[in-house]
Amino acid sequence: AAWAENMDVMWLLRGIPCIYYGSEVEFQAGAPCDKGPNGPLANTGRAYYGQNLMGNVSAENFGLFQADGQVKKTLEHPLARHLQALNRIRQAVPALRKGQYSTEGCLSNGGRAWKKRYTSGDVDSYVLVCMNGDATFTGIENGTYKDAVTGDVKTVHDGKLSTSCAGRGNARVYVLGGT
């Protein structure tokens, strides 16, 4: 859950997300980075990862793939699936990639909440994000919001949206206009 939460922050809040190979399967989780010049790398965070990539992958569109061999198991790991979903959501919502971040009017109970907006030309992307707890967003635009994670739809008439998102690593991503 901690890794999923970390990835939520990297993909939904900040600029360009970056992870090291192996993060998507928690490769060598808990292993020391280095045991000195005489320690075997196989027992460290710098162990060889290549065996996790053996097999064939054919990809299309964004995050859709067919795979076989060990790489299929790697890509089907729950954390890898979480990362794939975050990539699809981020790709579909311009505000997550380029938007201005704000916490004004974002009240969270037990988690984090923020909003982002991006406008350019005919693009106007507005998103409300809640992680790991309940959140209430006030002073927001009226309209229909769709959660990119669950598909839940909320219609706002009074500039206020409330949502619940219990548990570490969980997020709600309400997009104005539902795109």
Describe each model-derived feature in a short phrase.
Residues 156-179:
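C-terminal beta-strand-rich structural cap/linker in extracellular carbohydrate-active enzymes
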Residues 1-142, 150-151:
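Loop/helix patches that line or flank the sugar-binding groove of alpha-linked glycan CAZymes
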Residues 149-150, 157:
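Short, ordered coil/turn segments that flank beta-strands lining enzyme active or ligand-binding pockets
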